[in-house]
């Protein structure tokens, strides 16, 4: 009971703790900082150190966001940030951005955390929907990729498609032969 203005969906259903900030909000921050100005002021929030420095629910992009920008955001490993997975000790000499689970672990009584980037080797598939208002509604495109977003190519599938493209058909190829 109380005024609607006092209700916080996030606080009621998904209270923020270190894990939620570092594994979920950090990925939102990575997107936001790519398209909007002044997002570095929320780095401590994204890293799970300052839950009170809450990010906005949405941002105004500094310019029109292209499909390629969204593709690049989906392929992100926090490059160029304090959480850059290609530059920490886990990256080794090859700057490998992949970490094996669990995300949190302990060595000699000290707790550590691996990042949970947007692009990850556990991805089954990913997609980006592109609406193009100057075309008829059925000419929208679903850009579809299989496996890790950082290393997979994208196949355009038009919204007007009536069948699964041959290259993605279950009848095309065999995993056992």
Model-derived features: positions:
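C-terminus-biased signal that marks the final domain/tail of proteins
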Residues: 1-177
């Amino acid at each position: 009971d109380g005024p609607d203005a006092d209700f916080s969906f996030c606080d009621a259903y998904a209270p923020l703790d270190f894990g939620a900030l570092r594994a979920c909000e950090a990925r939102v921050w990575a997107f936001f900082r790519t398209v909007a100005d002044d997002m570095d002021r929320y780095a401590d929030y994204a890293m799970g150190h300052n839950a009170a420095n809450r990010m906005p629910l949405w941002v105004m992009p500094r310019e029109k966001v292209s499909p390629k920008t969204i593709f690049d955001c989906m392929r992100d490993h926090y490059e160029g940030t304090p959480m850059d997975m290609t530059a920490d000790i886990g990256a080794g000499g090859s700057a490998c951005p992949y970490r094996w689970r669990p995300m949190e672990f302990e060595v000699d009584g000290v707790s550590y955390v691996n990042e949970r980037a947007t692009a990850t080797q556990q991805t089954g598939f990913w997609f980006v929907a592109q609406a193009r208002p100057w075309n008829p509604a059925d000419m929208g495109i679903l850009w579809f990729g299989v496996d890790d977003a950082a290393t997979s190519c994208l196949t355009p599938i038009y919204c007007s498609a009536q069948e699964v493209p041959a290259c993605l058909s279950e009848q095309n190829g065999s995993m056992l032969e």
